[in-house]
Amino acid sequence: MSDDPAFLALGTEVSAKFKGAYCEAKIQKVDRSLKVKVSLKESPFGQMIVQDNDLPNAKFEINELTDVVFQRKFIRCQIQSIKDQSKYHVVFNDGDEKELRRTQLVLKGGKHFAADGNLDSMPLTNPESFSTPVIRGAAKRGAQKIRNAISEASGSRGGAVLLHNDDDENDEEDQEDGENEEDADDDDDDTEEQQQPRERRRAAAISAIGVLKKAIEDTQSEESSADSSEERERARSRRKRKDEASSAVTSDEEDQEDLATTDSENPVINGASSAAALSKTLQRKLEKQAMKREKQRLKEEEREEKLRLKEENREKKRREKARIMELKRLEKVYRTSNARIQENHEKSMTQIISHRSVRYFARFSDLKHRRKKKKLYLHEHRQKVNSRIRNVKLYFAWRFVAHKARLSYFARYALQWWRTSEDQAYSLIRTEKLLRSQRRRDWVGSWLEGLEREKIRFVVIHESYTQARRILKYIERGTEKRTFAERCDIEYEDIESSTVSSHFRDQEWFPAVLFPQVFSDENGSEGRQRIVRHMGNGQLVQVWEDDLVPFDWLPEYSFADVTAMTEKKPVEMRRKFKLAWRFATDYAQNRLDARSIRSILEWKFIRPSSRRLKITPIPVQAPSPNRCGEDHDDLVSTPNESDYDSDATIKNVDAETKDLFVAMLVQFHDAHNSVIDTNPTIQGHEVDLYYLYELAKKTGGPKKVYAANLWSDYAKKLVPAATDAEEELKTIFKNFLESYLAINTKLSWPMESLQPRTERKVVLPGQYSESRKKRTQAIMSQVQTPPTAPGSSKKGRVGSGGTRGRKRKVSSESVQLKKRNRKSSSRATTASPGPSEDRFSFQRPQDSDDVTDVPDDMTDHEDLLPEAATRKKYERKSQTPGRRSLSSRRDDTTPVSSMAAAPPKKGRPRKNTTVTTPVLSVPKSEGRGPRKEDTTTKFVRANVLSHILSGQKLRAFYGDEWFRANAIEDATDCTDEIMDIMLAHQDFFTPDTPRLSPSAIQDLDKVLKKIRAKTHYTGWNQRYDEFMKLEKLMVTVEDQMIARGRFRHLPRGRELKAETLALVEKHFRADDEDDGVPKTLAFYLKIAQEALSLSEKRAVADDDESSDSDTDFEQKPDTSAAAAVNGGKSESEEEEEEKTVVMGGDEEAEEEVKSEDVLVESVDQESPPTTSQGTTTPETAATGGLESESDEPEYPPVPEELVPPPPVLLENFPSTDRFSSGGSSNYPTLSRQGSINSMASPMFSPNSDLSLSGPLTLPRSGPLTMANIRQSPTPDEVVGSLRKRLSQTSESSESSELPPPPSAASKSKRIRRASERSIDSASEHHRMMRSPRILTTQHSSGALIFDISTTQPTDTSGPIEALSVRKPGRRKTVFAASPTLLTSGPLTLSSSAPPPPPASPAPPQHAQKTLGRPRKTPSTSSRKPEEEDEAEQIPTTVVGVTEEASVADSSAKEDLTSEDGSATPQDEKDDSESTTTTDTITPKSIRGGKRRRGGGRFGGSYPVKPAKPGRKPKDPHAEEGADEKDPEDQTPTTMTTSTPTRADSFQTQKNRMAKLMEGKPHDYSFLDLPDFDKIIEEAPKEDINILMEERTYELREIFAQCKADLSALEKRYRQQNEAKRKAEFAAKTASSAAAAQASSSTCSTPRP
């Protein structure tokens, strides 16, 4: 309509369109938008269409004058037309809301609501009151006729109305109304009979109007005004009150009507005037009452609205106040954090000032009136004295560029920033600006995908190859056709022309990245094809090389030209074209730093915390114990102090120590041309580098830190308020502390390297260490367990091999120790957990495939353990962070009985002490809820090489987290297809381009998309199974290794190269971020070689494999228990467990061997361990018995064939066929598993090859008693047996003498070592004769005695034979007929004892303990020539100096006598083979021997200096023995390389050594060292540092040994010179005295 407004206001009642019908509604919200057409009244005149915003103060009506903005000025105009484009948000009566246009709304005006009353009068709300439809006449007559009819009816029946009842009154009124209507309607042709029913219906409808009209209006108004449920409730209450008021008013009106009708004095003329007057009065009263009710309603609504607004304002103020308080709190915390960080930065600046400089120094400004805070400035020295800094300029230069590149906290460059030029710095800044956006980094990363480190080369790709050929033909006109390399060498100036410029401006082209691969045509044509990546769509395109146009040919275009070319591209390609143009142009012009592009793409940009950070920053440093009582800030939450109990010493270290650490760290990085921020932050919280370094140092080296994966624990201690700070903390450690910790852990300091690398304490004589207590308790626990049948299920049995449901016995201490070892595993790797985790595992019959550590619910049964066991804590920690002794790993498997045994008293442990303690069993954890996940299991991302089988453990990715899962079905097997693709790729593979071809990548991607694995979540949703892609799965390292090796078993598996497998692995694991170290192609090549060689190792079977299986079957009839433990292990894991353990190997070699189920042998304490029922333990169990801390190998073993023997043993090396390895009857020899009958071969066999030998085993034996020690023969028997052997040897010198077959007792006692076995091979025999092996290091504790049994002259030497034996508490290496079985002493060299002369009486000896340490016997060198000749025929014992035969005889006689003084015939038989007498060489005399508890590196440490005797011995050569203290009072010595001596004088030895050294260079080959250059060339790169470290230690020991030997030689030389001088002086004195006596006698003789 013309009178409608331009737009509708809020609250306007309209008729809105809803589902095709118009319903009543009210406008609630308006989004105004008017389109106005105006005519300008001023220049430039005309008409224009503007928006309502352009008419700021206009009244939007037609023909209204206003001002419009045109060309930044106001012009007078007139509105011509208005078009409403607004959006109206309306609310209908029933509460529905909708947004409509103006065309869907209609105002409530006269056109639609003119007959308001008639519409309401229609009987639509009461259908029961009418039976026929309403006629049109009643609607047309209007309201006036209705009112007249009512007045007529009421006037004609005025007095009689009150006398009739309601029904009669209604009937009469209807009748009268019908009559009056008939009189009034003169035009109606109907009869009176026909009109009466019609009038009655009309009267009934009119009467219904009065009752329903008000109710309908109130309902409609209330529903339209009710916007919420609360308003509807208020409307109901108002409606109720109105109904009550209307009823009261209605009653009053009726009374008034009656009174007015009754008291009316006006004459009634047809009843019309009184009725009209009454109706007007009634109408006025009704109107007044309605107005009154309306006012009352408005007042109530206003009152309620005020209350609502007041409540809303109160709530709004409360929220605003809370928001302001929160902002103030955050601002306070933010300022505090910034102030603390700023203070730490200033502190770091002062810490960096640690070097001297000549030019620069730093100072703080004192301009307090300008700045409130001091600032550090850099100044240049003029006097060039007392300078402080060199690194400040470096620091400022680096911070400037890093700040520009936003790299101050999370990136580190290897560049020397102080040498960076301005152009280089700006190139870095330009590179960072270009790659600042995440979208740009993604695009550039996709363009460079597939390129390793090559220089990027760009080309131009045309939409049609004809366009490219046209421009190439134009440029190469008049010349020969060039190759692509020749085109790239053409300068731009040579081709610059308008034609070239217009070509690139008009044609369709796009930049592309060129790949270096070159492919020949499959059809056999001469052309070559290249691979390019389209920088618009990112696809790989294979094009002819002749059609490539170098990007350098593009001319320099202006900004307008570039914009025009960009506009020609499709809309979705414009942004990429612009970025590609910019990137390629800047890169070609060297405006970008090519070295930092990939670094920036690999960075994780971490945004600094803003003021809107919701996480409250908490100081990093934990509160110290002495500040616990102080008041803390309410804004700073105090972390849990239990997390810092173990690190209290690190937290509370003084500031001087931290400053010293920071200074050394900065100096270290400065030496490596790098600068660090000594106060790094994570999410606004500072990280204490000293704290992090100490935590990592306690764990071990960097490899152990990465393998332990304790970043979450470190983050809780360092930054407890930060969330998900593990990766950032790992980055900080890698950038700041990794190299520094590696240097300090491996090489350490020179003074530290001179100290013995052991964790043992110095044990004084009589002192008893904790490790001895523990070993004694362990052996006592074995002794107290009685032997039972293998198949019995007795609960008291420990380690029975035949029981199915045996239980493991553990204690609370072992549980705590196991938890600690999870965090600090020794020599752990990322591929497999350490051996300490599998040495003592728990069986779970229902989950046999999962071998885990001690379950969590084991702690619930601590009340079952003894009080002492639960109260005791493991306090013996490793003192050397880089290594861990074997004892600390063996301690993890200590049984409960050993822990529960009462601690013995200090001193030597008793032999036959037994403690009976009931063995406690911890209940199994079946049905106790979910077990804790084994955190040591390593997972890697699955790729196309993975082969997922049913039951494998997986990790599934859902949302933003990895969950535990299991494979319930085998994944799609595409092994053959993958194999074909890899073999096809090998045809194009070249060593110069180690990368996959694009076709192989596409084929492998297709295969990867086909592979699906059906998994079952165990950590997120356990109700459903799901088919998942390999990209969202992780598999274990062991399963991935098996999957790689399965390609070797295919028919063409031998053709597959490890390089191809490594390339595929690297391509699909390029984005693997789970590993701590960066993965290179060499890493993947190494694991590929291991995987492919794994199947070959399976094919190489051991010689005694069948016997091993037979032995195991006989000894373990029921192997279900062992299968329950190893059931979940793969074949590769079982093979890893069966690796041969080299005796004397390093820790790393030993830890790689996984131990099997350790079966503890039951030992009878009354009988020797000769029963056949005892189970044979694996080699790992035998080595596990080395519980002494001195058993830890110092260096990794060197192959014996590479190490020649000592130079003294090289000359006249005797035949090795006569030496037996059978050992003694008391101590069995070492041999293979199940091959006990092959013990008669000699020890130094030429065919012994340990590299192909199987696993070595040692049987576990019980405690040794005097009943088990064979009795030593008498000296006469010794001499007789020796003479017998010498005569036999002289008779058959060429033939080898074999010992008698071993007895049954010796078979069951000890199995031979690999070094004592032999194979028959002549070539190996000659090789061993050329380069005989040196002694294998026996890592045991106790006396190490070498028997030299030979018939050669005294200037020759034979091999040294060593036998290993077990005893309570430690292992020792002893020999046949040795009296020092249970004693400890230094290294002793002894030869066959000579028969003592019968005429020489033995000097008296003091009483000596049978099992005590060997005492040193004073020796003399003043012998007669006849005695020396006899010594050459029958050599005597050599102890550094020559000793008398009588002394040796007496010593042998005493030592070879048992406690009861008798010798058994079996002992005499054994002594016939090798009979020796021994004496000891003190540490100071030979400086060698086994390193023992408390000993030093070079011959042992002496806590008390030996006192020299008060008087000199009669024998001059006895001074050496007098200078030394008795070995009983000395501490053990360390193990060093011994220097054998000869049984001759010092001069003879000196002359022989001079003859040997003549004409020979002093190089490594003469020092018995292998060719180190050759070892370095053959060794992998990652092992070079370890080999150099080992060589350093070896050279140090050689130097120390030589120095010690030289000192001993000099001392002996001085002693002999002194003795010679004294002898000469005595002879001279005697001769002079004789001469004087002769002269005196001559003088006194009387003359005849």
Swiss-Prot record:
DNA-binding protein which modulates activity of several transcription factors. Plays a role in the modulation of endoplasmic reticulum (ER) homeostasis during chemical and pathogen stress, including exposure to the Gram-negative bacterium P.aeruginosa. The keyword Transcription applies. GO terms for molecular function: DNA binding; transcription cis-regulatory region binding. It comes from the Eukaryota. The lineage of its organism: Eukaryota, Metazoa, Ecdysozoa, Nematoda, Chromadorea. Residues 861-878, 925-935, 1313-1326 have a biased composition (Basic and acidic residues). Residues 655-745 form the ARID domain. Coiled coil: none annotated. InterPro entries: ARID/SWI1_ChromRemod (IPR051232), ARID_dom (IPR001606), ARID_dom_sf (IPR036431). One of its GO terms (biological process) is regulation of DNA-templated transcription. Residues 166-193, 219-228, 251-260, 848-860, 1102-1112, 1145-1154 have a biased composition (Acidic residues). Keywords: Nucleus, Transcription, Transcription regulation. It is found in: Nucleus. Its main location: nucleus. GO terms for cellular component: nucleus; transcription repressor complex. Residues 1165-1185, 1377-1392, 1474-1486, 1531-1541 have a biased composition (Low complexity). This is AT-rich interactive domain-containing protein arid-1. The keyword Transcription regulation applies. It comes from Caenorhabditis elegans. The gene is arid-1. Residues 1195-1208, 1393-1404 have a biased composition (Pro residues). Residues 261-270, 1213-1251, 1348-1357, 1542-1551 have a biased composition (Polar residues).
